[in-house]
Amino acid sequence: MERSVFYVSDGTAITAEVLGHAVLSQFPVNTVSYTLPFVESEVRAKAVCEQINTLYQQTGVRPLVFYSIVTPTVRNIITSSDGFCQDIVQALVAPLQEELNIPPTPVANRTHGLTANNLGKYDARIAAIDYTLAHDDGISLRNLDQAQVILLGVSRCGKTPTSLYLAMQFGIRAANYPFIADDMDNLRLPDALKPFQHKLFGLTIDAERLAAIREERRGNSRYASLRQCRMELNEVEALFRKHQIKYLNTTNYSVEEISAKIIDILGMSRRMY
């Protein structure tokens, strides 16, 4: 079964996408997604409504519509469409209003927009991203005292995407350091990292998966061979055990899951932005 899914919002549509994906993941259904942010005017809403209706007429299957829109007139246009419309925020607002005993004050773009209240947090997140980019793949070993976590692992085991996700999603300053083939003859923990052992966290991966990833990057090479991958992983995991560095096999985890596990295992403060 395949269903069309619309994520419609008067803001970035990130909230609609995240919650919509979370709900749909519970069902064995294939989807074709349409993300429509900044639907703030009636003109724009009517165009979206027409798009939904046209798709319904073409396929005969009612599109699913997850929306988050503050302005009533704009919201009503969307809900008048032929789609199966679900307000992904309002379902939680009513019971929360009863519990807090205060009415909500809806404001467009509040979730991911800049306000006087969150400007400092935003600046901290941008600083974390800048730091992470400057300390990617062992580019710099300076200012490691400012890092909140230092990821270690062989090439292509997920260090860079995980570091960037930690910075962008949680404002965590994440450095990462690669162990390459040339290190394997005399693998050791670099002196520059030793003072920060409490910040070190290792990433590993199944050799077969690593070989497949490397094959896409550099096919038919020693670098991508299964034998080379196994050797590197064995050496690096032995190093982790020797220095009592906590580590995680990333083979069956998404970058979101890897990041959440690192935060949990290291007992780090988890801040959403």
Curated annotation (Swiss-Prot):
InterPro entries: Kinase-pyrophosphorylase, PSRP. The keyword Transferase applies. Bifunctional serine/threonine kinase and phosphorylase involved in the regulation of the phosphoenolpyruvate synthase (PEPS) by catalyzing its phosphorylation/dephosphorylation. This is Putative phosphoenolpyruvate synthase regulatory protein. The keyword Protein biosynthesis does not apply. Keywords: Kinase, Nucleotide-binding, Serine/threonine-protein kinase, Transferase. Its EC number is 2.7.11.33, 2.7.4.28. ADP binds at residues 153-160. It catalyses: [pyruvate, water dikinase] + ADP = [pyruvate, water dikinase]-phosphate + AMP + H(+); [pyruvate, water dikinase]-phosphate + phosphate + H(+) = [pyruvate, water dikinase] + diphosphate. One of its GO terms (molecular function) is protein serine/threonine kinase activity. Belongs to the pyruvate, phosphate/water dikinase regulatory protein family. PSRP subfamily.
